[in-house]
């Protein structure tokens, strides 16, 4: 692809994403499906703006590569060892059972047995990019089902190696393509990568970090990820597996969070590009000519994988309320099918339109997953949020809660426990099914679902409640929920969690004056203890803490970004210069004795 064509393609990708994803979010179908539909629109079977799909699809796999690196950073080797049973037990069972059933059905559909085996293995794989994205959106990452889902996906990535090696054997060309010496060299190179990464990566990043130049650290991170991907690709292995291993090797290093921050922006953009590329690859011509075959294939594929996954989740001991989510999030075909089927086609295992039919089936199955997850969410919401059959209800089951708490993470738990301890009637909204089940055991009134849905808020008693406490992890969800409450439930007293000054400014601009910055109060308390440790009288340190809180809050309100950036920067610099002077002057002039009951936020 020429430079000008690449630039044009980049502009088209960005335009498609900007146009389609917000529309998909407004329709409630999720960002992933929005990307897929955008790809169909600009691809060769849509408006035809881009025709070189294969090259773009290969490039867009970098999104999956970056995603797997970040996942590796979150899993240290000891944690990976703890998951061995689910990886090699449930993961292997899912691939083998699904592949066997699907291969048998393909043989009934007049596929050669060799092609059916390859087709069954390819269809048994799930989309790592889509599944992980949806698990993050649905809050499944910390749940049992999310951990099991990740284990299955990891085994599927490991299964890439033997699956690709199996293709020439099935094609009858093993003598020409299977070289034991080359295999041994690949294993040796892989071992060198593991050992070298284990002992060299930390010293290298320590040397780079010592330079103090953030851009160089980001460049080094990109170099590591891309080098690991290219190295594994040269060995004929999965690029995503290589970067995952690199992430695991750095998971226990002191640079883990900095590495994650450096990669995260690239990961999100390239993942979007990957989904757009998958949408572009959908062959609508094959779909039109074999509509019934493709439709039946998609339904059968999703049903078989869901049934297999559901049964395995049951055997593994996953809660019944989480099994459907686990089964549906992995029910689609995956990106690995494109690689495996292309390799099989080069070995002439497929006849006629068989490869095209399989790829269309995989692509459409990926489009069904967001819709399937949305439907299951509604079903779970009706099931979990329905009226209790218990006649004996604890006092927290009052139909008219005083407070609605959105989110039951570490921040929300403290608030909910404090309110419960003071006999306040509360209702909790949470989208982690495991947390919902646990909270109900302890007498909390909990509603499962997305709190940004008006109907869920109504069901939770928003029309009768006095206050709502928003403790969402994502700032976007917080601001969306604030706007929703102001529009539909203007009587609610809104209190919110702010992750930092930027979100605090956004809340102030939205009219929310009661908020708490999650690290501010704890930092002030530690600062007070530091002053005491340096010899300051405890009472004086307490007064200093309260004065600083008031001054900081005043500056926060005065620096709401209503003017240009230069004006705001100028005011911030001026405020910093005057902070010490103001602090000392007001400490001296303060006549009122402040104590711990004064409220400044």
Swiss-Prot record:
This protein's UniProt keywords: Antiport, Cell inner membrane, Cell membrane, Ion transport, Membrane, Potassium, Potassium transport, Transmembrane, Transmembrane helix, Transport
Bilayer topology term: Multi-pass membrane protein
Subcellular location, principal: membrane
Database matches in PROSITE patterns: RCK_N (PS51201)
GO BP: proton transmembrane transport
Domain RCK N-terminal: start-end pairs: 400-519
Residues annotated as transmembrane: 4-24, 29-49, 55-75, 87-107, 111-131, 152-172, 177-197, 207-227, 230-250, 262-282, 284-304, 324-344, 356-376
SUPFAM superfamilies reported in the protein's UniProt record: NAD(P)-binding Rossmann-fold domains
Disulfide bond sites: none
Single GO term (MF): glutathione-regulated potassium exporter activity
Domain of life: Bacteria
Family (UniProt): Belongs to the monovalent cation:proton antiporter 2 (CPA2) transporter (TC 2.A.37) family. KefB subfamily.
Purpose: Pore-forming subunit of a potassium efflux system that confers protection against electrophiles. Catalyzes K(+)/H(+) antiport.
NCBIfam families, A to Z: 2a37, PRK03659.1
Protein name per UniProt: Glutathione-regulated potassium-efflux system protein KefB
Origin species: Salmonella schwarzengrund (strain CVM19633)
């Amino acid at each position: 692809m020429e430079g000008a064509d690449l630039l044009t393609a980049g502009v088209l990708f960005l335009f498609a994403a900007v146009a389609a994803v917000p529309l998909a979010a407004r329709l409630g179908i999720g960002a992933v499906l929005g990307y897929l539909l955008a790809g169909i629109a600009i691809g060769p079977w849509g408006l035809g703006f881009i025709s070189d799909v294969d090259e773009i699809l290969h490039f867009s796999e970098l999104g999956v590569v970056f995603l797997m690196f970040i996942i590796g950073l979150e899993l240290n080797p000891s944690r990976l060892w703890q998951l061995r049973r689910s990886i090699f037990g449930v993961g292997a069972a899912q691939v083998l059972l699904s592949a066997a059933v699907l291969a048998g059905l393909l043989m009934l559909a007049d596929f050669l047995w060799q092609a059916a085996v390859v087709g069954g293995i390819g269809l048994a794989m799930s989309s790592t990019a889509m599944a992980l994205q949806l698990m993050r959106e649905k809050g499944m990452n910390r749940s049992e089902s999310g951990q099991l889902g990740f284990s299955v996906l990891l085994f599927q990535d490991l299964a890439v190696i033997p699956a690709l090696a199996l293709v020439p054997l099935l094609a009858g060309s093993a003598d020409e393509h299977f070289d034991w010496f080359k295999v041994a060299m690949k294993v040796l190179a892989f071992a060198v990568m593991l050992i070298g990464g284990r002992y060299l990566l930390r010293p290298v990043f320590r040397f780079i970090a010592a330079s103090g130049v953030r851009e160089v650290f980001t460049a080094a991170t990109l170099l590591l990820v891309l080098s690991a991907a290219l190295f594994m690709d040269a060995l004929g292995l999965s690029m995503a597996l290589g970067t995952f291993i690199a992430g695991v090797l750095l998971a226990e290093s002191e640079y883990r969070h900095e590495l994650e921050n450096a990669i995260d922006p690239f990961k999100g953009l390239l993942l979007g590009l990957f989904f757009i590329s998958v949408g572009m690859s959908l062959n609508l011509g094959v779909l039109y000519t074999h509509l019934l075959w493709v439709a039946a294939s998609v339904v059968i594929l999703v049903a078989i994988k869901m049934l297999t996954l559901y049964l395995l989740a049951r055997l593994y001991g996953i809660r019944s309320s989480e099994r459907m989510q686990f089964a549906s999030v992995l029910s689609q075909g995956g990106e690995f099918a494109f690689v495996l089927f292309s390799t099989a086609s080069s070995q002439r295992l497929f006849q006629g339109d068989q490869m095209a039919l399989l790829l269309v089936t995989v692509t459409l199955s990926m489009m069904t997953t967001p819709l399937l997850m949305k439907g299951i969410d509604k079903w779970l919401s009706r099931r979990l949020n329905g009226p209790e059959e218990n006649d004996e209800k604890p006092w927290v089951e009052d139909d008219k809660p005083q407070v609605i708490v959105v989110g039951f993470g570490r921040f929300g738990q403290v608030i909910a426990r404090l309110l419960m301890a003071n006999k306040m009637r509360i209702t909790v909204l949470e989208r982690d099914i495991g947390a919902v089940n646990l909270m109900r055991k302890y007498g909390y009134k909990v509603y499962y679902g997305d709190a940004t849905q008006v109907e869920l808020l109504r069901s939770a008693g928003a029309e009768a409640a006095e206050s709502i406490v928003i403790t969402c992890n994502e700032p976007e969800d917080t601001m969306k929920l604030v706007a929703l409450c102001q529009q539909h439930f203007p009587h609610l007293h809104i209190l919110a969690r702010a992750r930092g000054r930027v979100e605090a400014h956004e809340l102030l601009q939205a009219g929310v004056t009661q908020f708490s910055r999650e690290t501010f109060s704890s930092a002030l308390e530690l600062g007070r203890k530091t002053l005491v440790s340096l010899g300051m009288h405890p009472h004086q340190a307490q007064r200093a803490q309260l004065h600083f809180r008031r001054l900081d809050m005043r500056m926060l309100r005065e620096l709401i970004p209503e003017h240009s950036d230069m004006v705001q920067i100028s005011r911030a610099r001026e405020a910093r210069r005057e902070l010490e002077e103001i602090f000392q002057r007001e400490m001296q002039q303060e006549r009122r004795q402040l104590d711990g009951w004064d409220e400044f936020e």
